[in-house]
Amino acid sequence: MNEEELFARISGAEETPDKREGRNGLREIAALSMTKISDGLIDPKLVLSWLLNALGAPAAFVTALVPIREAGALLPQMLLAARLKTLAHRKWMWAGGSVLQGLAALGIAASGLAFEGWLAGLAICAALAVLALARAACSVSFKEVQGKTIAKTRRGAVTGLASSLASVAVVLFAALLLSGLLQDRGAVVIAVALAGVLWLLAGALFSTLSEPASEVEDAPGLPPLRKTLAEDPDLRRFIAVRGLLVPTALAPPYIVLLSQEDGEGLLGQLGAMLLASALASFLSSYLWGRLADRSARMVLAAAGGCAALAMVAMLALYWAGMAGTVWAGPVVLFGLMVAYHGVWQARSTYLVDMAPKEARARYASVANTMIGSILLLAGLFGGAVSTLSAAWALAGFAVISAAGGALALTLREVERG
């Protein structure tokens, strides 16, 4: 079976793609699978949070991980999108971003071996900031490259298969942690180093794609952020709702902190949390997506409420002295990640349905810039409060999430025109 036939079978194509597309498709699946596996092995919400806590880093560094990763991947996108237009072959931005992520991940692994305490926190957070910026470059460039190398009816198969393969790998990693075969934090450092190697390999493989040259353009100006916000009240309210729901992304490290503070911080507990997170994604994403097609605002409202309930449940377990039990963190995290995926699905659906067709890219870039800024501010709030108590920071996030869910009910129902 040649490359074209194999890719046709994988993608379910009715017609066999040409040789170039078949080769590109297989290489994109392999490269994306490696990067998505890396994402799971280095997950800041769980893996890096656990590692920093095990290294004795102050809580402020642990709680800074998600804001650094998420905001760092959002804020530069407008600038990088402008730069992308000046490149004839846009695969190089993705390949370069993947290589830089790999080097940053290896830096995190080295820091985990060499440092402890606040020095480990500082070094790992700095390396994660570099990784986040590189991730932004990959995010901006991938759709451009895929649009030129894979036919429209086969693109979803590429990303879908890569996600499925990565999910299996992360579940296997979680199972190893649960099994007790891996006994110390060195196993987590090795996993982070493996993520770095996979990113390097993915970048090298992606650079071999056969990409048609694009017409080089002058870098366009940045979208008028203030004007865009001023002219559309629906966009302003949507950004406010999405901003109030950022605790769904920020809260997992606090659950890790409370679990380890009240328990023994065993690797098996980390494995259980990774498994719970993977199951939440697998079981809820499709359902949330279908519900968002009916009413994205109701999904945002429900997800905000679910997130608040999950955080309150963790606080109740913590104050009852049960947060360190082997089941508490994973069960609460499952509920929280179900809510997170609801927000993730509904925010995209609502923005696409709300925005005028000709302004969708502009609305998305403005929303991402605003949310990146809000993530940083929320992260600073959480970090400041966590120096006093991670529990009180989580309580604050529960209130904010509930407010976001309530405000979502006031959004216009865009799915019905």
Question: How would you describe each model-predicted region?
Answer:
Residues 203-219, 409-417:
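Helix-loop junctions on the cytosolic side of multi-pass membrane transporters
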Residues 99-117, 306-323:
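C-terminal ends and interior cores of transmembrane alpha-helices
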Residues 54-55, 86-87, 145-149, 258-263, ...:
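Helix-to-coil boundary motifs at intracellular loop junctions of multi-pass secondary transporters
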Residues 298-343:
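C-terminal transmembrane helical hairpin of 12-TM major facilitator-type secondary transporters
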Residues 28, 119-128, 237-238, 324-333:
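Short hydrophobic/alpha-helical segments at membrane-entry points of transmembrane helices
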Residues 28-46, 65-81, 97-101, 127-184, ...:
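Substrate-agnostic recognition of the 12-TM MFS/MFS-like secondary transporter fold
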Residues 85-100, 293-307:
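Cytoplasmic membrane-interface "Motif A"-like loop-to-helix N-cap segments
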Residues 2-75, 234-273:
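Helix-loop boundary and gating motifs at the non-cytosolic
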